[in-house]
Amino acid sequence: MNKRSLLFVSLIGIAFVGCQIFFGYNDFRSCRTLTEKQKTITEQVLAATKSMGLSVSPWTTSLEEETNKNHYAVRVGDKLLLLNQGGSASSVYSSGVRWNFIEETTACDNIHVALYGEANETTTPSNMGKVFLPVTNEDLPVLVVEFRNNQEPVVFLGQYKQEQGKVYNKDSAVYGTSLVFWRSGNEYLPLGIYNSKEERLESLDLPITKAAVFSDSKSANAGANSAQYFVLSNEYMQLIVSQESGSIEGINLPFSSEDNKSIVNEIGFDRELKAQVPSEASFPGLPSVGANNQPVSDTVGGYYPLLRRGILSDAKKRTPSSYHALNIVSGRELTNSVASGYRVSTFNSTMLELESNDGSIKKTYKLPQQQPYAFEVEVGVNRASDDLWITSGIPEVEIMSNAFTPAIKYHVIKKNKGQLDKVKLPKAKDPLALRSGVYPQWILNSNGYFGIILSPLTDIPAGYAASYVPGSSVPTRLSLLSPKNQAYPASKYPGYETLLPLPQKEGTHRFLVYAGPLADPTLRVLDKAYTNSKGESPQYLDCITFRGFFAFITEPFAALLFIIMKFFRMITGSWGISIILLTVFLKLLLYPLNAWSIRSMRRMQKLSPYIQEIQQKYKKEPKRAQMEVMALYKTNKVNPITGCLPLLIQLPFLIVMFDLLKSSFLLRGASFIPGWIDNLTAPDVLFSWTTPVWFLGNEFHLLPILLGIVMFAQQKISASKKKGPATDQQRQQETMGTMMALLFTFMFYNFPSGLNIYWFSSMLLGLIQQWFTNKILDSKHLKNEISVNKKKQR
């Protein structure tokens, strides 16, 4: 090799070594810079988390030993978490404090995570229950404590990708085994341990590390890990609480059975929905867990959904969380949820406590066992605001006498007396109605037979709000029935929501919520339970008001008739029979008046030939003929309108019964003849078909047909006793009778079966009474004498 070649090789070697030294030094500087940066970040993060009870410190097995810089522990509140290779010591020392061993669990790569508590603790911490992470497609912010061999742990804020189960750090990769924490309010909760080799976050089975990890298949509660809803239930109701909104997505009332104390009966809509769309008649209907942290299995049927749930099978058509019950909202339209994403801190059979991820809202639902269809909610607000409202939720649709009858009312104290005022329902053009200057004792959002009463137990500002929600935004379950025929289009049934304001300061606000039937037995119990020491009752019974144009007149009488019906129901055990017995009772009560009317009609029939003579005699003098006829009526004590009297007598009772059936929840779902008359507040159904027919719909109702036949027969029996040719007036009466029979048949075709039973029974008893009275009068000729020109005539 010549000198030139040797010089070239030497220069290349020197350049290579120089490059190695240069890049090595740069790597060293970069590594050192990164280490310093990580140390700075660690110090900054720990400084910020110290006030929240999270810190990192070395630990040793005795106070005499020199602090081992290779062993570090994470302090979370009054607990200590440390990693080891197993065989945890019974006690350790950290920050000059003795910590006693509580429990240990095996994590990834045979690494053990041990839990220690302060030495002065005398009890072992109980399992605090699952803490469910908010379900979101976005990365979840977490705090990571990364343990590296023979180095002080690195602490940084990272991101947790729920779908992949990975933890990310924007500055560098996560190399070492790490403990991951999730901030909830003003504290950090242990979320799990991150396996950097498999890039997977795994949960830890320790009392204070019960946060759910959705991608962890090894979790003891894997079924609960995907839960989005929590079920709190008793014998009266099933509450479905949303993890996203922290509010109530569903209030399901069980049908009456031997296993519960509910008074809600199954009706035709429930059976049809279960048969046509069973997935939409399932309860809870959404992935849920109970107080035991186990998934709650769906059941098809068995419940009445008091709140609109939307279309469960279509996530886009479910009821938006802003319309959930007991949601905290704000904004111009009062539809913006204040907080989104909640964790559970306490969950047992009677109480569910949640806190929003940002710590601004805390809710506690308490479900008493003895108060029917009632529960309490405590709302803790940790930030002052002048625009916070609590919602009632939107009741499901009830069809009453073939009509949709929502109502909003509020109860106030005026002149030391309770008063129930009705709220005019808002319209689509002006969907939000705000009222100030009023202090409601409670506010009712009703669909007819059911209602949601929101009653503040602590002081709140004056005012209330009522909101109109388009039916397409919160579709009713009825829209799923016969969708091809558009029997119950969602747009036809808008929703209505009530709201109460919250105080403009931090604090805890309590509310009593009644969510159930507007029935005397349950509301009376609630009134008694919440009567104060002064004997002042909240007067929830005022919710039961009679509906109708003449309710202000019929209400006292309807209340009296219902008392009589309840007496007959107590004797017979059947509401249908009690309606018939009530009809018999009223017929006996009015027997003298009806008998007088029938006798008067018989006298009219006897006078018919003489009236014809007068009309023929004074054919050219109609006024004289009219005067003579009236004199004849007066002489024989006959009134021409007595023929209409039996029907006129019955009309007030008919109106009262109509109002009674629309206002008495106990008759809803009450069966009389199974398979035919299954609900006294709905039309009877002898049979049905698929394609609707004009007027008849897709159901055949027999009771109105029978009613028309009886009315026609009564008119015929009345006409059969007339002698001689019929007068014009009599022919008009016969025509009117036939028309009335047809009119009542058509008018009553879609009326409640209970009303048809009453009217049919009344007409049938009237027919029997008329036949019986005619027989008696025929056997007593002297009683049928008439006078013409002051002479006795037969």
UniProtKB/Swiss-Prot annotation:
Signal peptide position in this chain? 1-18
Disulphide bridges: none
Q: Which sequence ranges are marked TM in the entry?
A: 449-469, 548-568, 570-590, 641-661, 693-713, 740-760
Q: What is this protein called?
A: Membrane protein insertase YidC
Q: Which CDD domains match?
A: 5TM_YidC_Alb3
- Coiled-coil zones: none
Q: Which gene encodes it?
A: yidC
Q: Which GO terms describe its biological process?
A: protein insertion into membrane; protein transport
Record HAMAP family: YidC_type1
UniProt keyword Transmembrane, yes or no: yes
The record's subcellular location field reads: Cell inner membrane
Q: How does it assemble?
A: Interacts with the Sec translocase complex via SecD. Specifically interacts with transmembrane segments of nascent integral membrane proteins during membrane integration.
* Protein family membership: Belongs to the OXA1/ALB3/YidC family. Type 1 subfamily.
Where does the source fall among the domains of life?
Bacteria
Pfam families in the record? 60KD_IMP
Q: How does it sit in the membrane?
A: Multi-pass membrane protein
GO molecular function, a single term? membrane insertase activity
